[in-house]
Amino acid sequence: CPHFIELGDSRRFLNIEVSRPMVRIKNLVHTSWQTASTSLESRVVISAREVFDVFCEYGETTCHPAENGSYVICIRDTCNVHIDNYYGLHGWGFQGHHGIKGLYGNRNTFNRVDFHSFGYDVFFKDLTVKGRQINLQGGNEWSIEK
């Protein structure tokens, strides 16, 4: 299991930041027991921004539930993202923010799926949403199947 150190005292703590295209993250297990008094709402486990071809496979993230947000995976302005076999009960689960084109997910469990601004061509198969909701904004093709 990899270990990551959080640096800084800002509102946003990232464990993994994807800043180049064609990245594969496999077999990640992340356990975090922060509480609301330690900025739980500002945490993101995996973040990708302005890249393409991102593959997240076989991962699990767990922590104390949070009402006010914390995302397992946060994707911004990115194309061709694949998320397969993820179990994430870390605040709100998955967030697509400011634009995703081509999101593909298979066999995932999230506490919440949340799109801010827009998502285009989004396909989830065998998706389980536990606890919260799905917030969709965007267009073109959407397909969400159990």
Report the location of each language-model feature.
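Extracellular/periplasmic carbohydrate-active domains that bind, remodel
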Residues: 1-146
